[in-house]
């Protein structure tokens, strides 16, 4: 026998709308580079503004050159970053050196600006073990390949920071596809329960490889998923570097003051394929959509903003481009000199003390490699 309920008791539509309405998109610069939210303007000096722009231009060149090197067979796995410079670099710009980064595979630029030598970034793309070894002064893990797994790791690292009394944060990056993984919810829930100083950045570039965000989740925003974990959520224009910086700086301040983690959803777009491993974006998105997002380009709008303030010029930008090209040239040359990878290398870097069940295999490989 079925049951009947009084639907007037359950305001389903109103509840859903009310939740989504809490997460208005933060924007400071519009597509023309004009300030539309003076109250939210972050306190950045002229030199800081120019440095952020320099990093964005440099990283665009790095992306273009990396794609070219991949096509030449000189790089292996590569996930293009063009279009996401504001989401990646403006968020990183709000961090301190002692903060810990747990990136996804598209987030190599943040590692480079956090201190990872460029030649090691290229070695990571080539699958060389040296590319996964962070220098001791770089607080980061190598990029996570398993989608969403870094969320749980971030919760643990952040809790460790809290227990040690450190005034620093653990920040992680994933995409909208990562926000559909179980690890995403588990990590946020854990961090929220312990008020761990974590920042979860979801770069919503509209597609999990080829699956549009609308088919991944019924939620109107990714930011509202913070509600279930009892943490703070923000949605920002991910093509606006000032909005991304302001949101991240706010999240960091909350975290180090013991107020717990924050989920930041950046609305952004990747211009290229998901990776250079055969993905064809024309199969799942239209040229009109691509053109629409290219009109929002983060470098173009930030350039307009800085030029209006007299802080940037084509001459300055050309110097940055040439600097990037020269650095990349030298880094590739150094990466080419890396020793050939051996099986024993992988065993040695994995274990401080070789497990007994691998010791015999290790000796066998070592003998073979010595010949």
From Swiss-Prot:
GO terms for biological process: branched-chain amino acid catabolic process. It is an enzyme of class 1 (oxidoreductase). One of its GO terms (molecular function) is pyruvate dehydrogenase (acetyl-transferring) activity. It catalyses: N(6)-[(R)-lipoyl]-L-lysyl-[protein] + pyruvate + H(+) = N(6)-[(R)-S(8)-acetyldihydrolipoyl]-L-lysyl-[protein] + CO2. The keyword Iron does not apply. Keywords: Oxidoreductase, Pyruvate, Stress response, Thiamine pyrophosphate. Its cofactor is thiamine diphosphate. InterPro entries: Alpha-ketoacid_DH_E1_comp (IPR050771), DH_E1 (IPR001017), PdhA/BkdA (IPR017596), THDP-binding (IPR029061). It holds the Pfam family E1_dh. Its EC number is 1.2.4.1. The pyruvate dehydrogenase complex catalyzes the overall conversion of pyruvate to acetyl-CoA and CO(2). It contains multiple copies of three enzymatic components: pyruvate dehydrogenase (E1), dihydrolipoamide acetyltransferase (E2) and lipoamide dehydrogenase (E3). Heterodimer of an alpha and a beta chain. This is Pyruvate dehydrogenase E1 component subunit alpha.
